């Protein structure tokens, strides 16, 4: 999770993977030993960003596959990081980066018919998402995912979701610059270009 992030849903038939930009990786525990200068980007922040991206993929799924019987679906996501799980439901109060990401989450939820809920999963039961987070380079993602499908056959029907460049840019700015977006102003822009699913 310190170099890349990934997530999936068997029910919604998607998986995703992104490499964190160098400006984020340089500020993780891979390169900084402490937070004396306030520059460290914690794993909690990266896990929270990952949940937000998974919510975006879930929103894309529900908007692309509307159901007459469920006009207000809820994406029930699971995570193995208690801080990020709490931030999804209650918002972050201490971390400036967490608060900035909270505004991105807000922007994605305004006028969105898809709700969000989060449950806990033990790290030992989160092997697929952890595997997607450990792909070293995006160019290796397809072949690595093929090997994951061999280990976890339930992934066979999943397609790759690519978050929009605008979303990744806003998330990166929130993480690196603690940039606070105006949720009302950004909502329609983000919801109109969530990303796309590819084979």
Task: Show the residue positions of the predicted features.
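Two-metal-ion RNase H-like nuclease active-site motif
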Residues: 1-2, 51, 80
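C-terminal functional segments of enzyme domains
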Residues: 111-168
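Glycine-rich loops and low-complexity Gly/Arg-rich segments
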Residues: 100-104, 141-146, 184-187
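A structural signal for well-ordered alpha-helical segments within the folded catalytic domains
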Residues: 48-52, 56
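A short, polar/acidic, helix/strand-boundary loop motif
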Residues: 10-49, 83-96
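Short beta-strand scaffold segments in enzyme catalytic cores
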Residues: 3-8
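RNase H catalytic domain
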Residues: 55-134
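A cross-taxonomic marker for long C-terminal extensions/tails that follow the last structured domain
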Residues: 146-199
């Amino acid at each position: 999770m310190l170099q890349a992030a990934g997530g999936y849903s068997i029910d919604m038939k998607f998986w995703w993977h992104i490499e964190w930009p160098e400006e984020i990786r340089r500020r993780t525990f891979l390169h900084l030993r402490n937070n004396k200068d306030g520059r460290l980007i914690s794993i909690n922040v990266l896990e929270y960003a990952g949940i937000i991206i998974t919510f975006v993929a879930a929103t894309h799924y529900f908007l692309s596959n509307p159901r007459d019987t469920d006009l207000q679906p809820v994406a029930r996501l699971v995570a193995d990081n208690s801080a990020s799980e709490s931030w999804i439901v209650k918002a972050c109060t201490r971390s400036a980066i967490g608060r900035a990401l909270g505004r991105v989450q807000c922007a994605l939820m305004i006028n969105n018919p898809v709700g969000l809920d989060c449950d806990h999963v033990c790290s030992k039961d989160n092997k697929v998402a952890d595997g997607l987070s450990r792909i070293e380079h995006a160019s290796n993602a397809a072949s690595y995912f093929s090997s994951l499908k061999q280990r976890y056959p339930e992934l066979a029907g999943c397609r790759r979701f690519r978050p929009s460049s605008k979303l990744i840019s806003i998330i990166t700015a929130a993480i690196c610059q603690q940039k606070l977006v105006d949720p009302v102003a950004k909502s329609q822009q983000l919801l109109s270009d969530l990303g796309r699913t590819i084979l």
